[in-house]
């Protein structure tokens, strides 16, 4: 018992730790530690980062070093500029005075300094490349590992973890959050170290050149550092909240897109948009707060920087006037400190990126670090050489982690001997399926023990345990690959002969061989291209190929028609020979031959025995048998006919939403799913479908925020102009010492110019705040609008768009997560910086040409600057191509991840976690290789643009000396041109670092514009068409031909004609996959017929408004519920109004679910879990029926509406449905003939055509296909 308690305690601790957190905890959520961000760096990554950091440090040192050279050079100029100056020349000036102040001497000196500049530029070219490329390489390698580790961690979690955590958020984290980590730990960190070194080196050189002045300037620096630190802290907190809101929005989007048919059928688009928008609104609100806080900090930083300039020049000029320093010294100190402090400004985007990365990494690393109590990857545990198959449940108590207050099993005791077949029977939700889940160790019991061959299963290796068990569940999940691959999921390394043998045993061989691609046919996402019966048979083949010791059949034949069921049941009977088998079935005809039948009630077994024994006891089993047989003269079980002439083609294409709703709507193409071909087709699709957009088209997306953008641009222009104005003031201060003014005049002028610096600081504070706030707000509004518009456009599309292999849930949620934020990346604060830098350079050039007689030097610099810009353009072009490749390749990995996460229970049962990991890892190979290439491209182009600045220094001062020597320019004007143009060019060079963001934005904007402008053939938002006040319910199909868009060559309906009058009940019968559910989809107007016409009340369905057409009630075979309360799920039946609680309760009573709901602690407020996983199949089905009834529809569509119900529930629900269809037109699809015979009209469909029609008695008299079906049913009973 100690062993059990330890395990259970650990499980409880885990769930409480990983479950719902309190509000307080969320608010105080910390970020990952600085060094913790690099936890996945190996020795090579560390070497790359170390060398990259060393290169960044050298790079950061070279610019302040340049200022040292600049100081010496200034003192070379000063004597030639002001030979009659009475200023005492000290320090560097004394050295320079030893030179002959002649034109030749000046030019020779300047040539030497030009060589220094060129040498420093060459050094920058090398170290800048090493810095950027190595940091990008290290980041690319670490991100590759993080993606794999994160996916591994998800695959390693236990089912209980998914019950209490929103799986929908995981895909957003895999894309958006990992991208943020990549952004934060790559080249921006290299630039961070570069800026820090520039800051440090600047101050060191400042101290060496003039410690007094440096100390004065340094007095302001702690305040600047403090504001940066506070900003980073606040930013991390806001980023966490923003990411959380976006993750919630992403979870909503994934849930909605996964259930798109349910959403469209019930007209839930508006409701889902509001739900999505609510989370976006929260993210926008946090984002705007973040922008305000951040930009107050930036404004304060700039105010402090300019205040330090004012102080520096005021004190510096005093030192020059008192003959303590030369002007060269003051400039060396000033520029060194200036560069140091400006480098703090450049830290801002890098700190922001790293803060964002730390916030994003917190949740990811938390999941990676979560140790599951049931570890499917563990190598620990016993692996017996042989398994006999004796099973025992000893006093087992259990409740689900997400609903701990609801007890499911209350002391279950059950023994199953080796080779025995035990059938579990009982009402829906009594704990039968829970028993099967405990045996697979998907959960551990709260108390008690489950053992195999006398050994507690908790001591057996988890993977080994699951590999000896074969499972076929009520709602089987197939993966979006070929039929053969789906069966291979059952057991790796299985041969083709074994696959064929398994499908023959499962009665699937014939329909597979009739398909064009046979075993290589793609089944679509979640098996969407197959009918329910076909999916079930492939799932059975998958279980059989496993050759399991223990077989668990949870309603394994529920979706099959009579003939298929008989053959498959025989196959299962054969398969369970020599195996221990547990069968759960509602149809008692399938359990009567079991060795032991166990009757469940209230979470315990109340009776055990074989059929005859239990019939004598007249207990639960007897009651169920009598309920089922009463009134079923024809047969007590399931019937529907499958003709031998049935073509596999028509079977398959009834992709029919047999299940229309759970299977999730989005299907993949018929191309093979070999990785290479898939990638190739993806790339071709990109080239065809993504027209590139211009900057103006991207800007147009933000045009509604033009007042914000105008103010933002205006502020950015002012900020850009401040730098050239600074150049004028700076040159004037230098000029003060060139003129022969008296001491008092010089001091007065210096005081005035110093005060101007303070004024510039105040202006900067205001303009930086408004620039950041306006662009930040516009960017957040844009992100919200784009996500909303894209999601709205997705929900507008018709079902055929979702059928396209490019539009799976995974790729759509990936696009939603990344596209809007990518566009914002080019439009928000980055656009502000670009505008500012362009204004900076433009104003500098204009001032130099117009106000200064230095056009020759300006022109030289104007020739050099395009080279810097050219580097940026080349960089952008190259990176744009890489961004497009990355985007598509990561969409492929997103599809794989989504499929694995959504179908996690199936993946775990099949022990195929490692298979999905391998597939995911393979899908990451191309993005990984692209990231490594991109590192070098970015490194080369960045190094070029940076080095060109130094080369421009060399050219500027060499040519400046030439002009000064020939008296064509004054030194003051050389300084003005140099400061205005070169610093502007430096800003332009920095702009090129935004090239990757702009490249990504262009690709994303093209996708966004493409989907927003796409108008579907069947427009769910259309207000056009006739809107009759009342639909009577007359339905007519006239010569309807149809095939699914994904398989244009395979006909489904081939001239279908029938008519059903108002208030009549039409029953569609026929073989699995003959086109019955296609009729339902055409009535819902999910598709338009290829030929022929569908009429509603005598009007062609296309002429009616699409929302009016969809005012139908629908209950499908595998209903999808949303992760919200039971009340909200029922109310979802009618989204055109607010459904009252009384109506919800009434609908629940009619569907025989009220009593169960009322027994729950939270009653109608109980959450049902993702896709209703917290409920049994029967409970889900009854809630789906209540959802349809609350709509009070004129036409009711029932596609196997009672197939998942147990006998007792089915009888009551069938009565409710019979009552519900009074006065309504009903179209019913059912396999059980007991539910068919009372229909007003029975239509037998074969090969997409009506073969027989009439009442039950008329069709029996014809002795045709229907008669054969009845005979088959009679034999079975």
Curated annotation (Swiss-Prot):
The modification Phosphotyrosine is found at residue 641. Residues 633-660 are annotated as: Disordered. Residues 1-42, 137-185, 236-293, 352-709, 776-830, 875-934, 996-1277 are cytoplasmic. It comes from the Eukaryota. Its EC number is 7.6.2.2, 7.6.2.1. GO terms for molecular function: ABC-type xenobiotic transporter activity; ATP binding; ATP hydrolysis activity; ATPase-coupled transmembrane transporter activity; floppase activity; phosphatidylcholine floppase activity; xenobiotic transmembrane transporter activity. Residues 391-627, 1035-1272 form the ABC transporter domain. It is a multi-pass membrane protein. GO terms for cellular component: apical plasma membrane; external side of apical plasma membrane; Golgi membrane; intercellular canaliculus. Residues 640-652 have a biased composition (Polar residues). Keywords: ATP-binding, Cell membrane, Cytoplasm, Glycoprotein, Lipid transport, Membrane, Nucleotide-binding, Phosphoprotein, Repeat, Translocase, Transmembrane, Transmembrane helix, Transport. It catalyses: ATP + H2O + xenobioticSide 1 = ADP + phosphate + xenobioticSide 2; ATP + H2O + phospholipidSide 1 = ADP + phosphate + phospholipidSide 2; a 1,2-diacyl-sn-glycero-3-phosphoethanolamine(in) + ATP + H2O = a 1,2-diacyl-sn-glycero-3-phosphoethanolamine(out) + ADP + phosphate + H(+); a 1,2-diacyl-sn-glycero-3-phosphocholine(out) + ATP + H2O = a 1,2-diacyl-sn-glycero-3-phosphocholine(in) + ADP + phosphate + H(+). Residues 49-356, 709-1000 form the ABC transmembrane type-1 domain. Belongs to the ABC transporter superfamily. ABCB family. Multidrug resistance exporter (TC 3.A.1.201) subfamily. Interacts with PSMB5. Finds in a complex with ABCB1, TFPI2 and PPP2R3C; leading to the dephosphorylation of ABCB1. This is ATP-dependent translocase ABCB1. The lineage of its organism: Eukaryota, Metazoa, Chordata, Craniata, Vertebrata.
